[in-house]
Amino acid sequence: MPGINGAGPSNFFWQWRTDGEPVTEREHDSSRSASSANSPELPPPASPAESGRQRLLRSSALSRQTREWLEATPARVQGATPPAEARQSPEAQQAERIVQELVRGGADLNNVRTMLRNVMDNNAVAFSRVERDILLQHFPNMPMTGISSDSVLANELRQRLRQTVRQQRIQSSTPARLADSSSGSSQRSLIGRSTMLMTPGRSSSSSAAASRTSVDRHPQGLDLESARLASAARHNHSANQTNEALRRLTQEGVDMERLRTSLGRYIMSLEPLPPDLRRALESVGINPFIPEELSLVDHPVLNFSAALNRMLASRQTTTNSPELPPLASSAESGRRRLLRSPPLLSGQREWIEQSMRQEAEPQSSRLNRAVRLAVMPPQNENEDNVAYAIRLRRLNPGADVSRVVASFITDPAARQQVVNDIRAALDIAPQFSQLRTISKADAESEELGFRDAADHPDNATSCLFGEELSLSNPDQQVIGLAVNPTDKPQPYSQEVNKALTFMDMKKLAQYLADKPEHPLNRQRLDAKNIAKYAFKIVP
């Protein structure tokens, strides 16, 4: 028979040659020379290990699995490999077909290889839509249960991907510096930045004196060059998909400000998207549904949300065309003239400003509003109730949380839930001062890839929840959130903590107030254990 595949004790596939298979060239030459000389020779003495295997094979007490494994061992040791047609198992043939499908679909094979390893290691992943669709045909349970490290097909696929990627590198003549120019833009896409940190790149020197906590940036066994190339390819692929989706939505006349507001509320508070916006996103290839089993950071809607925020921010800075204000009423004009009058007392000025704010409010809102705060700017469109209440509390020191909430939520029945969410967020925020630190110099290394918005305005690191990060921004608490926890005395280690995703801890606190789950692995995350996951970035 042409070949048999059997599972050995470790669940790996082994191959062997049966009696009906063709002999190797060396065996054929030795038999031909022996017959031509007409002098039969005794076979060479068997090694002790081979003799032991033969004695075991003659034993009747062997199980079928052990007997098959013993028969496979001599062929593997002696190098008597059968032809390619007989050597390939069904799983190997299926793995080769998967690779061919990925190549035809334009997938990044190096990224698939890296992400497949992460799936088998139960780490966060980031496949493109094409890669995900192809793999789901062969691993349908991947989103729910992952892929077992004992899967024969998965191991065959990893081996085949490794061989194909190596061949592509040999054939490619693209200089590595082309990848260097784009690999520095870490976290430009929310998906790309997560996976880049899971496949750390080359280490760059940084000042040891500037680091307050030593960082292990040299884990063993990393393919540094392939990590940089994979990071650049993932960033370019994800950015192209997102830009195309934004272009099509703009051409279709979608209200991008409304889309940004709805996406922000959906991500932060899980408020459902309006049906028309959901259909618009699906029409450009973005499925907004976030299943429970999928890590939040892995979802493409986060990458799209960050790109949408950048696009609208650039529009606001470039479109500074002056517009005439609407005509004011006579009463409002009189109050404005009074405000420009220098002899006003502070109490008079505050009363006039408050009356102008009340005039601008709808009548129903004024009737239902229970209290007024001394400082109360309007709520932004992309600002949820928790974020707005925290901002009001900061602008009005000493104001009770319940009073702050009652100042802008008209329905008394809806106030208590917001109060509970705010208090949960306020419990997390003070933990920032207790976090372990990573210096800015270490954070800006190629492995971690942080880019401060003050130093890199065109290529800044974006928060997981949208805005660009900067240590000089007084309204932000910049942290790196790890996938795996470690106790407080231990410094950050890329090998132990795995991926490090940068974000604003204030935004994270708002997210955890509504849903206390780690955005990278869905584990519980609250004020009690956040110090095991988060690292404070310091100058």
From Swiss-Prot:
InterPro entries: E3_ubiquit_lig_AvrPtoB, HopAB_BAK-bd, HopAB_BAK-bd_sf, HopAB_E3_ubiquit_lig_sf, HopAB_PID. Gene3D superfamilies: 1.20.1280.110, AvrPtoB, C-terminal domain, Effector protein HopAB, BAK1-interacting domain. The keyword Secreted applies. Keywords: Hypersensitive response elicitation, Plasmid, Secreted, Virulence. Residues 18-31 have a biased composition (Basic and acidic residues). CDD domains: HopAB_BID, HopAB_PID. It comes from the Bacteria. Belongs to the HopAB family. It is found in: Secreted. Disulfide bonds: none annotated. This is Effector protein hopAB1. Effector protein that plays different roles depending on the species and plant cultivars that interact with the pathogen. Acts as a virulence determinant by enhancing the development of disease symptoms and bacterial growth. Acts as an avirulence factor by eliciting hypersensitive response (HR) and plant resistance. Signal peptide: none annotated. GO terms for cellular component: extracellular region. One of its GO terms (biological process) is symbiont-mediated perturbation of host programmed cell death. Residues 1-93, 163-220, 230-249, 315-336 are annotated as: Disordered. Pfam families: AvrPtoB-E3_ubiq, AvrPtoB_bdg. Residues 181-194 have a biased composition (Low complexity). Induction: Transcriptionally induced by HrpL.
